[in-house]
């Protein structure tokens, strides 16, 4: 059963395991679905909750949900590839906007940074995730940096140090938000429109 295929919608589905995380015992994995828009997300959810085959599959999962969070994800840039089978790395950082900075202002500056980074050879994808129902933290947004392969994150860090740190686009982000509490997850892309 595949909710994405049945709805004829583009979605990306990942199963990510915590790797660098402050509490590895808190959960075994994080299931991530990315939909093109809210209408597709909730059509997929309707199929998942109403379809007897989906319910039977859900009952067979080796784990129970401990938390489900609905989010809005603002795509900033894409990694080199999002093909199914890629073993990806995703780094999430909780961020609080500093006084006087709107989420839109931060987004626009981050888009400028990511565009410049990719024009200069960076292969990492970036998103801003705005948590909604089910979220119990106090972050204004979650900053996601993700790669098509685990090793690409290390290459991306070195590229940032040598090529991106001293750019005007990176300096424009300084002081807009405080981001910390980083966690890194790894896992396969299970389903992709590619």
Please name every model-derived segment.
Residues 42-45, 55-58, 107-114, 154-157, ...:
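Extracytoplasmic/secreted envelope proteins and their assembly/folding machinery
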Residues 32-34, 96, 144-146:
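Short hydrophobic/aromatic beta-strand micro-patches
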Residues 118-122, 146-152:
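Long compositionally biased, domain-poor regions of proteins
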């Amino acid at each position: 059963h595949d909710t994405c295929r049945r709805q004829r919608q583009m979605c990306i589905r990942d199963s990510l395991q915590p790797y660098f995380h402050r509490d590895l015992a808190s959960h075994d994995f994080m299931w991530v679905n990315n939909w093109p828009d809210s209408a597709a997300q909730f059509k997929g959810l309707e199929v998942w909750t109403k379809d007897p085959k989906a319910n039977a599959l859900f009952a067979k999962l080796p784990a129970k949900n401990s938390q489900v969070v609905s989010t809005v994800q603002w795509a900033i840039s894409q990694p080199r590839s999002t093909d199914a089978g890629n073993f990806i790395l995703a780094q999430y950082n909780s961020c609080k906007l500093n006084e006087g900075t709107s989420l839109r202002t931060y987004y626009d500056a981050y888009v400028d940074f990511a565009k410049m980074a990719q024009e200069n050879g960076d292969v990492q994808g970036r998103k801003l995730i705005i948590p909604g129902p089910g979220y119990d933290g106090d972050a204004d947004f979650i900053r996601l940096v993700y790669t098509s392969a685990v090793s690409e994150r290390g290459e991306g860090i070195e590229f940032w140090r040598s090529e991106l740190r001293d750019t005007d686009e990176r300096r424009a982000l300084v002081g807009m938000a405080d981001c910390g509490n980083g966690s890194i997850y790894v896992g396969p892309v299970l389903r992709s429109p590619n």
